Structure formats: C-alpha cells, structure tokens
C-alpha cells in the first residue's frame, strides 16, 4: 500500500492548481480523478457540425489576475473574450438555459 501526506480529489482547475503548486515545492501528493479526462467543468464540446460549445468556466476576464498569472507561467495563451452578440447562458443544470 502506498501512503501520501496529501491527497487531491478531483482534477478540475483547483485540483490541478494545487497539484502544480505542490510539484513546484517538491512535495509528494496523489491526485485522483473519477473521469477519463482532466479539467473538471472546463470542456469544449462540439455540435454535430463541429462548432465549438464551451461547457463551464467559459469567461476569463481581466480581473482574474491569479488565473491569468498561472496561465502565463505555464505558457498557455489566452484570447480576447467576446462580450457582445448573443449567447446562451445556463446558470445551473437544474434550470433552463437563458
């Protein structure tokens, strides 16, 4: 049996960020994820004709300074967020899209 001082449950944005910080600090950890992919609610799905549909965590604004800093540190490029036009917003899976 393997033991660890730190167990991270879930490989969404928070779990992956914690794992990254522990890795940088040279601390051992175990990261568990129930799904066959990482990212949690961050996911780009595609319609039947191939159009991208963002599922969860779709906005990255200038006020998200910590996340922007992390993305920069990791070499992940960002792009201008579209704020005009039409969008479908689903506040919860329990309520209809608006």
Where in the sequence are the language-model features?
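FAD-dinucleotide binding site
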Residues: 1-98
């Amino acid at each position: 049996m393997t033991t660890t001082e730190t167990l991270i449950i879930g490989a969404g944005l928070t779990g992956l960020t914690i794992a990254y910080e522990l890795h940088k600090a040279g601390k051992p950890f175990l990261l568990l994820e129930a799904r066959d992919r990482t990212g949690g609610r961050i996911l780009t799905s595609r319609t039947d004709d191939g159009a991208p549909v963002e599922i969860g965590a779709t906005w990255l604004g200038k006020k998200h300074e910590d996340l922007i800093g992390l993305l920069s540190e990791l070499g992940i490029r960002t792009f201008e967020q579209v704020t005009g036009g039409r969008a479908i917003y689903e506040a919860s899976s329990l309520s209809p899209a608006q």
